């Protein structure tokens, strides 16, 4: 049995908590959030357990938990992560790692070389369709092109002030692309954005080119009408090579493979598990199970979820934002 602490009980913190409640080998011992309303929600969820609740982290650092899940706001990630690492803790940190790469790099002296004490919550790395895609790619030739789209509702622009689509949503595609190219550094980046007339950014485009000729084009936007059906948001990833392509429509349960003119669909089954109703919930559960296995010394942090990977990806995001603004 591993004991965990959760820091930040907003939407993502509660999402993690609900999955943790279904895991037999885990006990949530501590929940921390400076917002009293969030703590009340946590008390309701864990009403029957022996969980402690606190408005501040320092008061519960000595509880002796095995690992921490940090799901607080991005602006607080570095301070909270540093405090826990200095106390000898192990962390699963929600994306993005920080507001800037320079902030993220300040943690370097505290992170193990293999990143065992800091794993990033890059959830799509544990998505069954993405894992099936990586398996299929092992039987193919080299990747030539990558295309990803991630549309969201128009109210994202106002719900997350100060966040652009590059850092809020495109980051998911950047870390999956990072894993697909084995962490290789692109030789060229370019980016464009549209600034909304009422403030903020609602469309972001990015292009990345690698020395071996791989091209990636990514788009993230906040253009879906607010009252549209939930399934209108169609996140997709498409990988192309010489004579073949594989399309991954997230959460649809299949891959579409085009090979030498023939089109086939490969099914991806969602296993029946209590508390798991869709592929994203399944991915979060898989991610949490990996973190527990990491605490038990049974696995390593995968490429794309290591501290050094997160720093490199944040450097990409910083550069893309600057390029889109015309500052670079």
What positions do the PLM features span?
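N-terminal Rossmann-like dinucleotide-binding module
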Residues: 1-48
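Beta-loop-alpha module in the N-terminal Rossmann-like domain of NAD(P)-dependent dehydrogenases
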Residues: 16, 46-108
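C-terminal helix-rich "cap/oligomerization" subdomain common to oxidoreductases
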Residues: 26, 59, 67-70, 116, ...
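Hydrophobic residues in well-ordered beta-strands that form the structural core
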Residues: 93, 118-120, 248
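A contiguous active-site-proximal alpha/beta segment in oxidoreductase catalytic domains
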Residues: 98-157
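Mid-domain beta-loop-alpha active-site segment that forms a flexible
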Residues: 121-128, 154-186, 200-202
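C-terminal glycine/acidic-rich active-site capping loop/insertion
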Residues: 123, 234-308, 328
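Contiguous beta-strand/loop segments that form the cofactor/metal-binding neighborhood of enzyme cores
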Residues: 172-254, 283, 288-295
């Amino acid at each position: 049995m591993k004991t965990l602490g959760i820091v930040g009980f907003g939407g993502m913190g509660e999402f993690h908590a609900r999955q943790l409640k279904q895991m037999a080998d885990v006990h949530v011992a501590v929940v921390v959030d400076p917002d009293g309303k969030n703590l009340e929600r946590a008390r309701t969820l864990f009403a029957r357990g022996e969980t402690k609740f606190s408005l501040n982290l320092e008061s519960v650092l000595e509880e002796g938990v095995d690992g921490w899940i940090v799901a607080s706001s991005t602006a607080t990630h570095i301070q909270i992560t540093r405090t826990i690492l200095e106390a000898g803790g192990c962390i699963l940190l929600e994306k993005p790692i920080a507001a800037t790469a320079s902030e993220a790099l300040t943690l370097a002296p505290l992170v193990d070389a293999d990143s065992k004490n800091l794993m990033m919550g890059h959830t799509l790395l544990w998505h069954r369709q993405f894992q099936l895609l990586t398996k299929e790619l092992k039987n193919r030739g080299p990747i030539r092109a990558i295309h990803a789209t991630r549309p969201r509702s128009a109210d994202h622009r106002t719900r997350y002030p100060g966040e652009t689509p590059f850092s809020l949503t495109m980051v998911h595609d950047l870390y999956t692309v990072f894993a697909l190219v084995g962490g290789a550094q692109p030789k060229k980046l370019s980016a464009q954005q549209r600034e909304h007339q009422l403030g903020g950014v609602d469309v972001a485009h990015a292009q990345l080119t690698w020395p071996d000729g791989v091209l990636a084009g990514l788009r993230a936007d906040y253009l879906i009408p607010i009252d549209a059906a939930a399934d209108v948001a169609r996140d997709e990833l498409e990988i192309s090579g010489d004579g073949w392509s594989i399309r991954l429509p997230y959460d649809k349960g299949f891959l579409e493979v085009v090979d030498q003119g023939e089109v086939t669909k490969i099914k991806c089954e969602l296993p029946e598990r209590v508390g798991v109703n869709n592929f994203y919930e399944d991915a979060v559960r898989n991610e949490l199970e990996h973190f527990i296995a990491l605490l038990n010394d049974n696995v390593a942090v995968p490429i794309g979820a290591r501290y050094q990977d997160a720093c490199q990806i944040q450097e990409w995001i910083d550069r893309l934002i600057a390029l889109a603004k015309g500052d670079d």
